[in-house]
Amino acid sequence: RKEPVTAGLILLNILVFLIVEFTGSSQNTMHMLDCGAAFTPMIIQGGEYYRLFTCMFLHFGIEHLLNNMLVLFVLGSRLEQVIGKIKFLLIYLIGGVLGNVISLLIELRTQDFAVSAGASGAVFAVMGAMIYIVIRNKDGWVICL
């Protein structure tokens, strides 16, 4: 396979989802917290900063998982081919964590806390990188999906 990181991330997300479902339910907020979902009070007051990373691999229900993985498959496969495995993985992981940090900062400002999970921040980072590449190369590069 030409896109091992994309495939690996998709498989990892599916595996984590199956483990969550076999040990409880991805629709159960308490179970998701036990599995590493993000919740600002636990991160800040409890010092559980790992949640900014672990929540990227958790999803609330099969639709949530499938939507994120579909976009990751379509855009991630092509982006990984263009920029390489290491850069792609860094964009995905750093983008996901930064997205979660931004959510945390917004929640601290608004004092409106919610349990959160999902790869959306990472997937949006992949989208952003793809858009950047298209804009930078608009005169001589076409993305064939």
Predicted regions and their residues:
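A detector for small-residue-rich transmembrane helices and their helix-helix packing motifs
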Residues: R1-L145
